[in-house]
Amino acid sequence: MDEQHYVYILRCRDQSLYTGYTNNLEHRLQMHETGKGAKYTRGRGPFEVLYVKKFINKSEAMQEEYRIKQLPRFEKLKLIEFQEQE
């Protein structure tokens, strides 16, 4: 069975953006919502999923997560907008 890997961007209640990686998107989002996800997202829910990109390779997904995390906010918003247009 091929495992899928995802990079995602969430908008938090305080309008901040959180970028993450997972191999089980539904479960990870549930973890964020219940306060058991990343330390950054605790107390910042509810969340809106703004961006999801699927990978078949964990290494590529993690590289993309790192790349996105290095971007300034306006570049992340452009990335989200571009995906919405596809």
UniProtKB/Swiss-Prot annotation:
It holds the Pfam family GIY-YIG. CDD domains: GIY-YIG_UPF0213. Gene3D superfamilies: GIY-YIG endonuclease (3.40.1440.10). Residues 3-80 form the GIY-YIG domain. Belongs to the UPF0213 family. This is UPF0213 protein OB0043.
